[in-house]
């Protein structure tokens, strides 16, 4: 799977989150990090979209929406003829959203300070995915990055890597398979650390076996209840 990350940040040089995200995927050859400029070559942008399977729009939240830079890019590149019309050039591709905010995540809910959830605010992108026959992915929202402690940043790094490269969904089984594949790569690349990494890999596989057994037991119990 090839992933294209469209970075729409009007002040990219001053961003704290974008260098973090860029570093997180720099060793993944199947991921393209593509910061937008103010002028677009439509044919080149459309070609990039066609070459990738998962398209991720990445931006800071500006007044409950994306920055004007992304809107300009979409209006220019996503022509009706290309994205919808008779071509549906993006049909079957995945569309993901990575949005960063300066507010606490708990503020984005009914009855709280911002009143609306991030998913509600991002509905225009879901509508776009529906119109162009793309698969809309769950949103990855990052709140108050500057206040994240080291362990939270590490969890975010892994979550971001999975969001951009994991072929499966967000279920434990898919996450475990992703971890196994990535650990195996590191074992091959760093033989000196293989013993420790092998132990971690063994633990993940063991937990997956336990989960499979639990799921099987639950299925059997459900069958007995239905009799």
Residue ranges of model-derived segments:
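N-terminal beta1-alpha1-beta2 submodule of the flavodoxin-like/Rossmannoid cofactor-binding fold
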Residues: 1-83, 171-227
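Short, electropositive alpha-helical surface patch
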Residues: 58, 115-119, 150-165
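Short secondary-structure boundary/capping segments
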Residues: 86-88
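A conserved mid-domain beta-alpha-beta active-site/ligand-binding segment of alpha/beta enzyme cores
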Residues: 130-145, 157-191
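A short secondary-structure junction signal
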Residues: 106-111, 141, 148-152
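Charged helix-capping and loop-helix junction motifs
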Residues: 72-80, 118-122, 154-157
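Short, glycine-/small-residue-rich phosphate/pyrophosphate-handling segment
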Residues: 91-137
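Short catalytic/ligand-binding loop motif for oxyanion handling, primarily in non-cytosolic enzymes
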Residues: 13-14, 64-66, 105-107, 146-148
């Amino acid at each position: 799977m090839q992933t294209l990350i469209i970075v729409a940040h009007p002040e990219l040089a001053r961003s704290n989150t974008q260098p973090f995200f860029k570093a997180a995927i720099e060793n993944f050859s199947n991921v393209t990090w593509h910061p937008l400029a103010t002028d677009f070559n439509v044919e080149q942008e459309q070609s990039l979209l066609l070459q990738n399977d998962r398209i991720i729009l990445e931006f800071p939240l500006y007044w409950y929406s994306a920055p004007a830079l992304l809107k300009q890019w979409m209006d220019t590149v996503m022509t009706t003829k290309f994205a919808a019309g008779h071509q549906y050039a993006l049909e079957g591709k995945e569309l993901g959203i990575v949005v960063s905010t300066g507010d606490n995540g708990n503020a984005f809910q009914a009855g709280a300070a911002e009143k609306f959830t991030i998913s509600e605010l991002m509905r225009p992108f879901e509508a776009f995915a529906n119109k162009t026959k793309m698969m809309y992915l769950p949103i990855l929202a990052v709140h108050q990055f500057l206040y994240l402690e080291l362990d939270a940043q590490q969890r975010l790094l892994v979550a971001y890597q999975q969001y951009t490269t994991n072929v499966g969904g967000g279920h434990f089984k898919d996450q475990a398979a992703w971890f196994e594949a990535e650990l195996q790569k590191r074992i091959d690349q760093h033989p000196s650390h293989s013993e420790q990494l092998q132990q971690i890999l063994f633990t993940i596989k063991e937990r997956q076996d336990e989960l499979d057994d639990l799921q099987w037991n639950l299925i059997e119990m459900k069958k007995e209840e239905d009799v």
